[in-house]
Amino acid sequence: MKHFVFLVALVCVLCASLNPVKAVSNTELQDTSRFARIISKGDTGGGDGKYIELSTIRDNSTDAHTKNIEAKIYVVLPSSDLIREYKVRYDYDLNLSLANMVAKASKLKTRLPDFSLHELWNIKMMESGIVGMVLNQQDYTLNGESKQTQPALKGYENVTFLTPTDFDFESYHVANRVFKMVYGTFYDDVVR
């Protein structure tokens, strides 16, 4: 029996060492060799912000019409003593980039005489072209200690600081900046 208890304890220690939770503190997020701050319109200037872990950015694109990026993004909320780590995946439909839609507007104008550029805005409001999904999340204190992650309310699993990616919302601007980090241009500047 002693051997069994020892074996179980050894397995637990090995599992914990192979799959450690890597906490991140607010001080670590300031290390520009590991993290880049995502400047976005939702920042209040009160110490909050969003940071992307540079080593986690993955371009998983498989075709020319859509781009797929995965990364870890940290949202800092000082008033709640909270850093929330999100592992996210963004899917970008290049046909729905704003520049691509504007480039094709003249064709629409010839087929639909009453078509105006304002309609493009309405189309983007209905279908932004970016789909964001939270794959995992973890909470930490500002000092980098693990915190119990609060489960999302049923039906709101993908309503976060980073999703859904509705056009002209904060989450859309973050996804647009992530695209620029990978491809060197904003998503809405891509013309196919």
Segment roles from a protein language model:
Residues 15-23:
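Bacterial Sec-dependent signal peptides at the C-terminal "C-region" and cleavage site
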Residues 1-4:
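Positively charged n-region of N-terminal signal peptides that target proteins for export
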Residues 7-8, 182:
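Intrinsically disordered, low-complexity segments enriched in polar/charged small residues
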Residues 8-16:
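Bacterial N-terminal signal peptides
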